[in-house]
Amino acid sequence: MKDEANRTNIKLLLQALLVGICTAVVVGLFRFGIEKTSGFWLYLFQLAHQNPLWFIAIIIGFIAVAVIAGYFVKQYPHVGGSGIPEVKLQLQGKLSLQWFPILWRKLIGGILVIGTGLFLGPEGPSLQLGSTIGQGVAQGCKQNKLKTRILLATGASSGLSAAFGAPLSGALFVLEE
């Protein structure tokens, strides 16, 4: 009986490790995408200072980003905003979301919106990206509700830690929730 409990705990620990590693990769990609997108927009503004016709391209680009972001939010309203309220509700068992549609829309939409310079920091979206990865691993491993919430919290704390570059901030978030 004790061996089975130990094996279950080791499996959960390995799954949590997988969640942490995947979250670090995805949030790293997220931050890299934001940096490159911001650089692209800065380059367009430099071109526009040399030739005002580039402002037309900038306006078209802003409209395209707004349309894409609006489309993502219309498809899945929980993609909009920071994602922290959704993660809290999921941890409390009051909200159930499909993890993969949220993951890729939040990743691409967040890169576009934050990289364009709109008022949203990467911390909340990173937290939600991590929690969706935790949910995905839990579903893939067919975990029960309790262990799913543990992996959700693991992903959320990993995302927050990766966003701030501070592991203790993620651990404190999980303890608070």
Place the predicted regions along the sequence by residue.
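Alpha-helical transmembrane segments and immediately membrane-proximal extracytoplasmic
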Residues: 1-177
